[in-house]
Amino acid sequence: MGYDFDRVIERRGSLCIKYDFAKERGRAEDVLPLWVADMDFQTAPEVLERLHGVVSHGIFGYSEGKDAYFKAVSTWYQKHFGWETERNWLVKTPGVVFAIAAAIRAFTKEGEAVLLQQPVYYPFAEAIRDNRRRLVNNPLKLTDGHYEIDFEDFEEKIIVNEVKLFLLCSPHNPVGRVWKKWELERIGEICLKHGVLVISDEIHSDFTYPGHTHLVFASLRKEFAENCIICTAPSKTFNLAGLQVSNIFIPNKELRQRFRKAVAQTGYSQVNLMGLAATQAAYETGEEWLAELKGYLGGNLEFVRTFLGERLPEIKLTEPEGTYLLWLDFRQLGLTEEEREELLVKKAKLWLDSGAIFGAGGEGFERINIACPKSTLRQALGQLEAAVRERPLAIDN
């Protein structure tokens, strides 16, 4: 079946954060947004059909997923990642960030240390600080355009700061790493050795590029499974963020009970009916749609790679292994953060995510979302090129 990912759908006026709140966030209303991580594509037709059925029924009472819901989710992870799950491991929440914040409260005390790896998805840092925990950073090492983990620093930071919990971003947002087996095993070994619980955010797991394979952290070893919480959701894969459903897997019974208690303390009870229906439909019927989408995104990546290489070589692409988010290095332009913001927002009329918000090591970078029609991407890069060419360049020869 051919899905039309070239179709441009008007999103303004649909209450979407990406398009409708530029003014409230300090941007001009005519900027082209490629910042927040949702897609400019409709979800799979099969998901829409299931939602239409729910709406036609017309009753939106309290709801809960049954056996078919768990079967859909578990079958997806078994088929795509070789990971066998059990139903009692599953805890549903309204979002992965919600789950991470709940885990921080459940497994650490105020003032205790939580480890992350910046530059990284900025709500990690917010969740740590908002819950009055101490942020400890194991900065990723950038070498020849490739990010790696400094394991010596990783273990030292854990020991010196008596870290209790580690937030793993896998695949990594924004740098695009898909961690290799040996890297995940080293993380698991160090964390077990020092009694550090691993919270693995695997929300981008369905988006990997050829030659790279996502590995569920809990699938590697039984002892890792007993020392981790796996955070998943259909929201990135099927563009369902607004329906607010996440599937959190916790194999360890004691950890699961403590996590459930932390969730209950927030007053949260059930996920919403539309989210349940969409999630089940997506995992039951969305495989063909996703395969075509990934092919389209691969084409978008190649377009960006070629465009920058031929027309904007001073802006460097960090070659992604996964996600539909690209990490662009603007440092060769020689601009301050304020000057780059002016270039992008006022001259290029683009709304990207400034690298600085992702923490230490993000300065001089921008994150761009390529999950959009190619015409949108072509327009964005054209505007960027025009803005760059209008100013003197500070390029090292």
Predicted regions and their residues:
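Conserved N-terminal alpha-helix of the aminotransferase class I/II PLP-enzyme fold
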Residues: 54, 61-94
